[in-house]
Amino acid sequence: VPMKNDIRAVTVPGAVDGWLTLHERHGRLDLDTVFASAIHSAEDGFPVHPTLSATLHLIAAVEHADLPAAAPAGAVVTRPGSARALRAIARDGRAGFYEGEFGEGLLAAGPDEFVPADLATVQARWVEPIKVDAFGHQIWSVPPTSQGYLTLLSAAIADGIEFDDDGLGAHVLVEAAIQAGHDRPTELFDGADPVRLLDAERIADR
């Protein structure tokens, strides 16, 4: 799969489907209220964080980007495309996104990669969460194909190492994350067994 600048690297986005699935089961506010703050920021603007300012040049070659290719920290920028997408979701739910302007744009950008049926297929599903016990807490995430197991595995590995909270602990956490993810390309796939991925012996081997 190409890393960037290629429509084949793009998947049908499941996050919006996930938001709405959660909202249907647990939401108490209407979608207009839920998205109001985000729409306001996208339409009226928000200050550029220094980290964003330093990385904006990376989108200079991206067509139709709704962020400028350069802006100093503190400058106010808007994201009109994001605002339109959020308004469509608030107004029409799932159809507003997957069958609206965004979905049409995705089909136009990848006519050989996507068909309308791809966007009509429900992306979200309810699954059994996975967890580890680390640092005196239960830490939960979602199973593969999510990368959430990497967070759990990192925490479990780090929990097995004695280190002082002297500022150097960050290095331990980084190394734990590296150990957790070193075999991700071969271990993360549809149907991967989360119990095996978080097995105590596998954690100890790291």
Sequence positions of predicted segments:
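Short helix-capping/linker segments at secondary-structure and domain boundaries
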Residues: 24-29, 93-94, 158-165, 184-188
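Internal maturation/activation junctions in enzymes
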Residues: 163-206
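Short linear sequence signals and composition-biased patches located at protein termini or domain-edge surfaces
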Residues: 148-162
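Noncatalytic scaffold domains of N-terminal-nucleophile
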Residues: 1-99, 103-137, 143-146
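Short coil/turn linker and secondary-structure boundary residues
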Residues: 29, 77, 114, 161, ...
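Short alpha-helical scaffolding segments that buttress acidic/His motifs in well-ordered protein cores
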Residues: 38, 86, 154, 173-180
